[in-house]
Amino acid sequence: MRGDIEQEKTLLIKRFRELAERYAGRIRDWEVTNETWWGWHNPRIAMNFYNQPDFVEWSFEQADRCFPSNRLIINEGPTKAWADFHGDRSCYYMQIERALLKGARIDSISMQYHMFFRAEKEQEITAMYYDPCRIYDVLDSYAMLGRNIQITELTIPAYAYTAEDEEIQAEIMRNIYSMWFSHPAM
């Protein structure tokens, strides 16, 4: 769909309207933007408009027009939401804050939680993701934006597909679900 920016906006508006006509009364929550750093400045992946500074704000403005009664969600992958976390100086936090300050109606903040790591590096890399203090730091920071938080697209692998691996996977899931849902912003 690469073209000039106005052409891309026209096609996006058309798509928003089509989705709203068909689903606005049936699907309550809409992810307006998803993984806005993925493919950043990669011409083979992203459309021209995707790289514009007002992409997020413009997208939420259009979504608000088409879905006035639905909940609008911003979503980001695990790297920007969790691994690159620096409190209110995190790029995802600042992106949301900027959009809100510019009047975007963002009803919910969503973060993905994929643990796609090789088995031999899994324990080392995921230590930060499974750390209760880190989880609460992330959730506390995003809660300061005054929106509820959702965790989406969750992946906790069972590497060997054995009963033991599945038990470990289940224990991790129980622990992180308990941490997430004990937070008041969830």
Model-derived features with residue positions:
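Active-site cleft segment of glycoside hydrolase catalytic domains centered on the general acid/base Glu
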Residues: R2-M94, A119-D137, A160-I172
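Structural recognition of alpha->loop->beta junctions
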Residues: E18-R28, Q95-S108, N175-M186
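Structural preference for beta-strand elements that scaffold enzyme active sites
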Residues: I27-E31, S69-I73, R105-S110, N148-I151, ...
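Short loop/turn segments at strand-loop or loop-helix junctions that form parts
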Residues: V32-E35, E76-G77, Q112-H114, T152-T155
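Aromatic-lined glycan-binding groove of carbohydrate-active enzymes
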Residues: K102-Q112, V138-T155
